[in-house]
Amino acid sequence: MTDTISRNIIFIIIMLLLTALVVSDPSYAAAATGSASGLGNVDNVLQSIVTMMTGTTAKLIATICVAAVGIGWMYGFIDLRKAAYCLIGIGIVFGASALVSKLTSAS
């Protein structure tokens, strides 16, 4: 039993390492580009994360999640409070960029 669990853990670790190796982008390890903030490539990495979280793929995933939550609520698998939490969370994720830009604007 313990042998099976340890084999599964080792397998998962190996698969995670292989996935990280395959999907890693060489541009993240490139030299700094000399941005205005002096952080170089860190700005690009953070912007890529924001784009990933609010881009087209994220909108498609959010649409599927809203539909799944709606169906779950309709059939009684999810109560209304959890459905509302899901929708509020999606609103916060997609509204974060606009909220931060309003808070940091000079006007």
From Swiss-Prot:
Name of the gene: virB2
Function text: The type IV secretion system VirB/VirD4 is a major virulence determinant for subversion of human endothelial cell (HEC) function. VirB-dependent changes of HEC include massive cytoskeletal rearrangements, a pro-inflammatory activation by nuclear factor NF-kappa-B, inhibition of early and late events of apoptosis, leading to an increased cell survival, and, at high infection doses, a cytostatic or cytotoxic effect, which interferes with a potent VirB-independent mitogenic activity. These changes of HEC require the T4S coupling protein VirD4 and at least one of the effector proteins BepA-G.
Gene Ontology cellular component list: cell outer membrane
Protein name stated in the entry: Type IV secretion system protein virB2
Family: Belongs to the virB2 family.
Keywords: Cell outer membrane, Membrane, Signal, Transmembrane, Transmembrane helix, Transport, Virulence
Protein's cellular compartments: Cell outer membrane
Stated induction or repression of this protein's expression: During the interaction with the intracellular environment of host cells.
Membrane topology (UniProt): Multi-pass membrane protein
Assembly and binders: Homooligomer (Potential). Interacts with the 17 kDa antigen protein that is encoded within the virB locus.
Transmembrane segments: 49-71, 83-103
Secretion signal span: 1-31
